[in-house]
Swiss-Prot record:
GO terms for molecular function: 3 iron, 4 sulfur cluster binding; magnesium ion binding. This is Ferredoxin fas2. The lineage of its organism: Bacteria, Bacillati, Actinomycetota, Actinomycetes, Mycobacteriales. The keyword Protein biosynthesis does not apply. Induction: During the interaction with host plants. In the C-terminal section; belongs to the transketolase family. It holds the Pfam family Transketolase_N. Binds 1 [3Fe-4S] cluster.
Length: 304
């Protein structure tokens, strides 16, 4: 039996709001199970609400319920996975142009797995590019971080897959996104935190769009990371020529001027992407500027 619970929260002002309904499962022995990917205080309170609404004798959490067993998905399967997500906010070009970098990252580079997404020594990946979640969700599904059938629920009521990723709902997601210009500053903070904790093995990757450089927060983070020599940090910039402020000398020159190691690559070439991300950048942060076009993104899908 499934129990749907609406919980009303009241605040000091006397204002009450209705929290979105959650679905629970109740077994024959009366146990109420809330299928969650990450436990939180909200989950606990909702389970208690479910217990009050049915004759439950026990409450338990089933964590990582959205996760699936390791899969045999390949890069060739990504277009089909992306096509399962439908709606007016698909941002198809952004998804296709982001797909190659995301795939290489998760296929060859990061030290992170669905079995240990919260390991203290894991590599971290932050998606800052606001129009890239569909490709991100597809790659996470292909790599076992979430069940492929969840892609069919994208952007629907109660789906964990929103227009922007939510780190409280999806295993392996390090950053709740949506607002441009936040990814690089957050990644700088993560890299600095790892240094303070004397954790020097984990790497921090952040994917941003060139249009995000219209946000001043990125320039501040860029300057600080260069001065602090945060060599655990790698920034991938997808350059599709949409930055309204313009880059007459190239994005890489801006990073280079702040003390970063930089490299320019073809954002649809998997070998170039892998080589750049594995580049030895000694005691400096690394900026990988990946040029992408509508044609290269379209060809990348058609050729694989």
């Amino acid at each position: 039996m499934k129990v749907v619970v609406n919980e009303r929260r009241c605040f000091g002002s006397g204002q009450c709001v209705l929290v979105a309904p959650e679905v629970f499962e109740q077994s024959n022995d009366g146990t109420v199970t809330l299928l969650v990917d990450k436990p939180s205080p909200d989950n606990h309170s909702l389970v208690r609400a479910a217990a009050r609404s049915c004759p439950a004798t026990a409450i338990r959490f089933e964590e990582n319920a959205m996760r699936q067993e390791p899969t045999e998905f390949s890069y060739d399967d990504l277009p089909a996975l992306i096509s399962r997500m439908r709606g007016d906010e698909r941002h198809s070009f952004s998804s296709s142009s982001t797909m190659d970098v995301l795939w290489v990252l998760y296929d060859e580079i990061p030290n992170v797995s669905p079995e240990s997404p919260d390991d203290d020594d894991r590599d971290r990946f932050l998606l800052s590019k606001g129009h890239g979640p569909m490709a991100y969700y597809a790659v996470l599904a292909a790599k076992g971080f979430l069940r492929p059938e969840l892609l069919d629920t994208w952007a629907t009521k109660n789906s964990p897959l929103g227009f922007a990723p939510d780190r409280t709902k999806i295993s392996g997601v390090e950053m709740s996104g949506g607002s441009l210009g936040h990814g690089l500053p957050l990644a700088v903070g993560v890299a600095m935190g790892l240094r303070i904790q004397n954790r020097h093995a984990p790497r921090v990757f952040v994917l941003i769009g060139d249009g995000e450089f219209d946000e001043g927060s990125n320039h501040e983070a860029m300057a600080f990371a260069g001065r602090a020599r945060l060599n655990q940090l790698t920034v991938i910039v997808l350059d599709n020529g949409t930055a309204s402020m313009g880059w007459p000398h190239g994005i890489d020159k801006r990073f280079d001027g702040e003390g970063w190691d930089t490299i320019n690559i073809n954002g649809a070439d998997h070998e170039e992407i892998a080589a750049a991300l594995n580049r030895d950048h000694n005691d400096r942060p690394l900026a990988v500027v990946a040029t992408v076009t509508r044609q290269s993104a379209r060809s990348s899908i058609q050729q694989r």
